[in-house]
A protein has these predicted regions:
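C-terminal region of N-terminal signal peptides and the immediate post-cleavage residues
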Residues: 31-43
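Bacterial N-terminal signal peptides
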Residues: 19-32
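N-terminal secretory signal peptides that target proteins for export/translocation
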Residues: 1-16
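Intrinsically disordered, low-complexity regions enriched in serine, threonine, proline
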Residues: 15, 33-34, 100, 113
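C-terminal PAP-associated
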Residues: 40-656
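Short amphipathic alpha-helical "recognition" segments used for binding
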Residues: 12, 17, 39-40, 139
């Protein structure tokens, strides 16, 4: 369903230069919200820019490796990089007990956890309060049995594929974290912790390669006496840029565990193809995000830190990433990184080309007058490879972020811009960071999602009940800039059909510049299904606003499935199509209390889906639960699970 809404906004603009660490002061102009107010003429604490070095790691290709058996081994689940703990109770699913814990990535935003805990307390007073706004009451979309025009779909990488890659020198991991990119006749998928390339018919063009090997690092683990550990990689993203015709794959790397040669530092990784073919060579780069004042990083409070869930976007001139920065006991908000797109593409293709610099912008404090530290500032990608150029701004990359901090619901989002991105190719880049807070439809902290009852052998063996699915929070998901509009969506608690369900709030924001950044919600709406839950949206549209919102769906009548709604002229249609119907309940280790670090009864899911236009089709992928895993080397279809997990991914395409 689609809604319209004029918006009000609050603005700020800052100029960043290259000289050392440049402090910038942002001034809040008067603005009266219909909810929480920002005091007039505030001075926000200084933010900073630092110029960092990009480091060449090596070259790599996506290639087949021998497969392991997938039999549970010790250790089976990666020890948390931020503190080990022991298995409780039954141990690792029929394997001997060993020190294990759930991997620490895609961490919760502290203020959102407070909101989750206060949900019940706030519910009674919300209806009569001006802010937070009340829970949205929305109509239900219809689940239909037919597909959109030109639909095609196939199974992507599964847990079995990931666990057995590289001769089984992998851990069991939940959730997959969906990376997907398409272009030039290819489709690439990257998940935790494997990567593969397909043609547009779904035929595999490469084997499944483990992510560590692809990024030119030692295997996650080689079990033996003693065990040999590699660095921990997670949170994949990928993008084919039609402007420079190169493939970009990003990952977070934490190198502070027990691996041999560990540096005790954290990095963002970028793999850039040397040609427009993802089956060919990639060049691997990295830069430090530890932010402890060492190795050219700024000195942030509570660090050494790591940059959780690196997000990926581009405009005409730059490649942009943003992270949520965490220390051992601290949350430092959002950090933005910018690199010259043409220079990194040239450096990938030629060893003699100079390496570009990395411009690091601390964007954590800008939203303090509105409730808290900024988080998950999603950079936009574009069907054309450029975020748009406005000559006075000399290049601009746009971002969106959510604003729900400490209350259950909110009706504001933020639009951001980094301008003068043309300067990224110069010796002294000079960027300007701007943002505007605008009013929007209401959204708020989701609850875990129920799934259809079925067989769950792992949980049954542990005498546990069937799991719920973790919908995480209402941070902004993937953003695309198409036809002059920024599209993005969030998970949200909604009231539909008289009951609370987990749904999706989506936004279409038109940004503009007239001395300052302006933003206006020109389209928005909800995706909701009575008696079911939809979550982890990604919007893929072309420049006419035609495409899909992709997501996962579950409910008392639905096993976890991959689903979508169509977008037509920038508006969502009220029909939910099931791209791949789930065949069993989620039955993975991450929701069973016997595994250290697990959330009792709530399994990790997502943490995000992906959708992208390739010029002809809209490609999208989401997590779901398949019954069997078709084998490339055999005519049999074995069960799509190991002892510890059973997730799969579905890759689909439609003609917009």
């Amino acid at each position: 369903m689609t809604l319209g809404n004029p918006t009000k906004s609050w603005h700020s603009k800052s100029t960043l230069t290259r000289v050392g660490i440049v402090l910038l002061i942002l001034f809040a102009v008067p603005f009266a919200f219909t909810q929480k107010h920002a005091a007039a003429a505030q001075t926000i604490a200084p933010a900073a820019q630092v110029i960092q070095n990009l480091v060449l790691v090596g070259t790599s290709t996506i290639q087949a490796t021998p497969l392991g058996s997938g039999v549970a081994q010790v250790p089976e689940i990666a020890a948390d990089s931020f503190g080990d703990s022991s298995v409780k109770g039954a141990g690792v699913a029929q394997a001997p007990a060993s020190p294990t814990s759930i991997r620490g990535h895609n961490l919760p935003i502290p203020s959102k956890e407070a909101a989750r805990h206060s949900l019940a307390a706030n519910a009674a007073v919300t209806a009569n309060a001006a802010f937070p706004p009340p829970e949205p009451v929305v109509s239900s979309d219809s689940v239909v049995s037919f597909q959109s025009s030109g639909f095609r779909g196939f199974n992507g990488i599964s847990h079995v594929d990931s666990r057995t890659a590289n001769n089984g020198n992998q851990f069991s991991i939940e959730p997959p974290d969906q990376g997907l990119c398409a272009g030039n006749g290819y489709v690439m998928e990257a998940v935790n912790d494997a990567v593969r390339v397909f043609d547009t018919q779904g035929n595999p063009l490469t084997g499944v390669q483990d992510i560590n090997s692809f990024f030119h690092f030692p295997a996650a683990i080689v079990r033996g006496t003693p065990n040999q550990f590699g660095p921990s990689l997670s949170d994949p993203k990928c993008y084919f840029d039609p402007q420079v015709r190169r493939w970009f794959v990003s990952e977070l790397m934490v190198d502070s565990g027990t691996n041999a040669g560990a540096t005790g530092r954290s990095f963002n990784l970028l793999a850039v193809s040397q040609t427009d073919h993802p089956t060919g060579a990639f060049t691997i780069f990295m830069y430090d995000v530890t932010d402890d004042g060492q190795n050219g990083t700024p000195n942030h409070a509570g660090c050494p830190c790591f940059g959780d869930q690196p997000l990926l976007g581009t405009d005409n001139f730059g490649v942009f990433q943003s992270t949520n920065e965490y220390g051992a006991t601290s949350f430092n908000g959002a950090q933005i990184y910018a690199i010259s797109k043409t220079q990194i593409a040239a450096a990938a293709a030629s060893a003699s080309a100079p390496l570009p610099v990395v411009v690091h912008i601390d964007a954590s404090l800008q939203l303090l007058p509105f409730g808290g530290l900024s988080y998950s500032i999603q950079p936009a990608t574009s069907p054309t490879g450029g975020g748009g150029v406005s000559e006075p701004e000399s290049g601009v990359e746009y971002f969106l972020s959510a604003l729900q901090f400490i209350d259950t619901f909110d009706n504001r989002i933020a639009v951001w811009a980094v301008t003068n991105t043309r300067s990224l190719s110069r010796n002294s880049p000079s960027l300007r960071l701007s943002f505007a807070v605008i009013s929007s439809e209401t959204y708020g902290q989701p609850n875990p999602a129920v799934q259809k009852a079925g067989e769950f052998p792992l949980g049954t063996s542990l005498s546990d009940t069937e799991e719920f699915l973790n919908t995480n929070d209402d941070r902004m998901n993937q953003v695309v800039f198409a036809g002059g509009v920024l599209y993005g969506g969030v998970n949200s608690l909604l009231k539909v059909g008289g009951a609370e369900q987990q749904g999706i709030a989506w936004f279409g924001v038109k940004p503009s510049f007239d001395d300052r950044l302006e933003g206006r919600v020109v389209r928005q709406g909800y995706v909701a299904v009575a008696g079911a839950n939809v979550f982890f949206p990604s919007i893929g549209v072309n420049n006419t606003g035609n495409g899909v919102i992709a997501f996962s769906m579950s409910g008392t009548e639905y096993f976890p499935s991959a689903a979508y709604v169509e977008m037509v002229n920038g508006n969502s249609r009220p029909f939910v199509h099931i791209a791949a119907a789930g065949q069993d309940p989620e039955d993975g280790f991450s929701g069973y209390k016997q595994f250290a670090g697990a959330t009792d009864g709530i399994a990790r899911w997502g943490d995000y889906s992906a959708a992208v236009a390739d010029g002809e089709r809209i490609w999208f992928a989401s997590e779901y639960i398949p019954k069997a895993c078709p084998s490339v080397s055999s005519t049999t279809t074995p069960p799509c699970r190991t002892v510890n997990a059973n997730w799969g991914t579905s890759v689909s395409a439609v003609h917009p």
